[in-house]
Amino acid sequence: MTVDELWQARAAAWELAALSLRYPGSELAEAAAGGEWDEAAGEILAALGLPAEVPAAAGDPAGPPAARAADTAGPAGADALLRALRPEATRLFVGAPEPACSPYEGVWAAEADGVQPLLFVNPRSMEVERFMRSCGLGRPEGTNEPLDHVATECELLERLALRAAGAPASEGAPDGAGLPGGSPAAAYGRFLSGHAQAWMPAFAERLAAEARHPFYRAAAAYLEALLAD
């Protein structure tokens, strides 16, 4: 594998992680129901040399693979899976009154420091926002989602990996020398070690423990394996 191919594999890895940890949509449900998610996760981890046991994303994890595929394949299976994933994602990541597994780095940092977490205005969230803006990634217009959401952090790593593989900068993003550390690879390494690896392993562990649907146990195992790269 060439250096560019390695970065392309990393970009694909974080793209799948971001898709998996956003609020579920039809793209995710179709991929998980049809088996494409399982195939992609296995191929990506193998390409990166990260052996891991990732459970099946859909169906009865104890049942035979053929039966799981038959139960979930096709539009009806994807629709049923989406109806199951959305309330589970809400319970896990939004909660009432508290999420079972907060998806925000700032909340995890505050918890580690023993202080009350505040979205947006806590020091870690503000640090993440500054880093992302320095890479050309800001909050989408008309939204108020904090940028330290796990899926957004995965998206940043995907973008930096693509830049390291030779992709051009998106509109409004600095050139390579203008990124933190002076290059896409350096910015990727800084964010991975300084942010993602600082809190996502604990997030993945709690997600695996709290998840009631097989998909989120699979997503947790995949993320945990990816963080070892």
Per-region residue spans from a language model:
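Surface/interface-facing alpha-helical segments and adjacent flexible terminal/loop regions used
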Residues: M1-D229
